Structure formats: structure tokens, C-alpha cells
Amino acid sequence: MSSLCLQRLQEERKKWRKDHPFGFYAKPVKKADGSMDLQKWEAGIPGKEGTNWAGGVYPITVEYPNEYPSKPPKVKFPAGFYHPNVYPSGTICLSILNEDQDWRPAITLKQIVLGVQDLLDSPNPNSPAQEPAWRSFSRNKAEYDKKVLLQAKQYSK
């Protein structure tokens, strides 16, 4: 890990511990030897109140490359997560996570998790990553909503 990457991730952790959005969690993963792996985090994103996603806390992994913050982290839900902008592998398709689109080195973990939370209830139909969820969202909203509610129940605490 480059010193710039390490320095930035230490700063991110410090900022997150001081100030993070209510209902969210994020922490570096512990390695087998008990030390922290600052390049891999586990986080949870609550569904917004008043949406079909409410009641669930959705787990993600955030993996930072050695080139961070020049390159964005890879952010993933569990494989098979049902959403039009999530690949079957769980990888999230979001412009702020794409270095060829809106990624900027100043983007923080807090901005990333808030962006993912917004994406849950406001999918981008022009950037489909998963055919079944995209098709339901585009053509059969009632079926889509039913599947989202089932998933919210699956991830409720």
C-alpha cells in the first residue's frame, strides 16, 4: 500500500469515527493476525424511511486499491443482490465509483455510502447492470416493488 493510500485511509477512518450518518456503519476488516486491513472495509447502509428499502440494513464491502485515492474503491453488495444497478457479482454501478465518469480523489467514504443509499431507491435506468431487476423496474413496477420489499425483510435487523 502506498503511503498516500495509507495516509488517506487512516484519515477516512478518523473522520468516520467522529462523524457518520445515523444508522450507517463502516469499519476496516480484521486480518487473521488481529490487525486492521485498512484497504478492505465492511459497511452497512440503511434503507431510507418512506421507501420500499426502509427497515433493511444492506451490507457492502469497500475495497481500496493501492492507487487510492487516484483510483476509486470497488464497492459491492453480496452476490445476487436485487437491484437494476448492481451486477450479479454484487458490484455496484454508480458514476462516482467509476474513474472514467464522476470519480474524484476528494470523494469520501461518507459520500460513497450516501450515494449508494440514494441509488437504492432511485435506480438509473440508463445504466442497467442486472437484466431481471432492470426489466422489472422498467416494465413491471409492482413486481419490482414486491421483490424489493422481500429483500428489505431479508436484511432487516
From Swiss-Prot:
Its main location: nucleus. Pathway: Protein modification; protein sumoylation. The keyword Mitochondrion does not apply. It comes from the Eukaryota. One of its GO terms (biological process) is cell division. Interacts with SIZ1. Pfam families: UQ_con (PF00179). One of its GO terms (cellular component) is condensed nuclear chromosome. Present with 2600 molecules/cell in log phase SD medium. Signal peptide: none annotated. Its EC number is 2.3.2.-. It comes from Saccharomyces cerevisiae (strain ATCC 204508 / S288c) (Baker's yeast). The active site is at residue 93. This is SUMO-conjugating enzyme UBC9. Keywords: Acetylation, ATP-binding, Cell cycle, Cell division, Mitosis, Nucleotide-binding, Nucleus, Transferase, Ubl conjugation pathway. The keyword Coiled coil does not apply.
